[in-house]
């Protein structure tokens, strides 16, 4: 006789992506999707209503942001296990999500079978890291890095600046005033010991966040 199914909640701001994951997950006999959310704010609200066993979520979303949403989800439903499914393939994003309380990290390039296995593994109390990410993390120092001192918003501004975006462009995308972005930039430079955007880009490349 089959055991109880794993109740899964999906969090992603793209409806088509959620639909694809729903079809994949519900094809597994031991799983069902009990809730969906398109933003961090929605996820925090929905998780209390559906009480999932596992939350499969992206971290790049509008609103409060993925890491803050992750923390609030675990505060509202501490019994839930969070599996991050992200487009980011670098160790730094994985490290930040695990530090925030995620039980696993998988990239969206992973095979369908890997997602199903990851859900089962974290549901059973284990952790799951994609092999490529695990190798990157193992190769990095276990001591705190300067990038770990950045807040979630500072980290987003840092990535944008290192990618070549201007303060005005970042202000528009993040719905912030240019002066607020300028304040973040000042704090980022102080924390990372960088003098200009070129040095920020170099730090990002060394961390695997940008390709040369």
Language model segments and positions:
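Short hydrophobic/Thr-rich beta-strand motif most characteristic of the beta2 strand and flanking loop
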Residues: 30-38, 46, 194
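Short, flexible helix-to-coil linker/hinge segments that flank and couple to helix-turn-helix
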Residues: 92-99, 103-156, 198, 209-211
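Short amphipathic alpha-helix used as the core "switch/output" element in two-component signaling
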Residues: 45, 67-79
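Recognition helix of helix-turn-helix DNA-binding domains
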Residues: 166-199
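Active-site residues of response regulator receiver
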Residues: 12, 58, 86
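Acidic catalytic/metal-coordinating carboxylates
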Residues: 39-42, 62-68, 89
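Short, conserved "switch-loop" micro-motifs in signal-transduction and mechanochemical regulators
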Residues: 88-89, 179
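Active-site beta3 strand of CheY-like receiver
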Residues: 50-56
């Amino acid at each position: 006789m089959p055991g109880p199914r794993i109740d899964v909640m999906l969090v992603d701001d793209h409806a088509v992506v959620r639909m694809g994951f729903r079809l994949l997950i519900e094809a597994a006999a031991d799983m069902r999707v009990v809730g969906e959310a398109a933003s961090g704010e929605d996820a925090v609200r929905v998780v209390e209503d559906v009480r999932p066993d596992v939350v499969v979520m992206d971290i790049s979303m509008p609103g409060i942001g993925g890491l803050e949403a992750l923390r609030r989800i675990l505060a509202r439903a501490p019994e839930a296990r969070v599996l991050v499914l992200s487009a980011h393939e670098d160790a730094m994003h994985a490290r930040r999500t695990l530090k925030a309380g995620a039980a696993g990290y998988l990239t969206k390039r992973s095979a369908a079978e890997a997602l199903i296995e990851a859900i089962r593994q974290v549901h059973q109390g284990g952790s799951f890291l994609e092999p490529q990410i695990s190798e990157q993390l193992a190769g990095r120092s276990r001591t705190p890095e300067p990038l770990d001192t950045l807040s979630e918003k500072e980290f987003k501004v840092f990535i944008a600046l290192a990618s070549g975006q201007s303060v005005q462009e970042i202000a528009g995308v993040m719905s912030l005033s240019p002066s607020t972005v300028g304040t973040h930039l000042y704090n980022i430079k102080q924390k990372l010991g960088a003098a200009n955007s070129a040095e920020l880009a170099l730090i990002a490349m060394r961390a695997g966040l940008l390709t040369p």
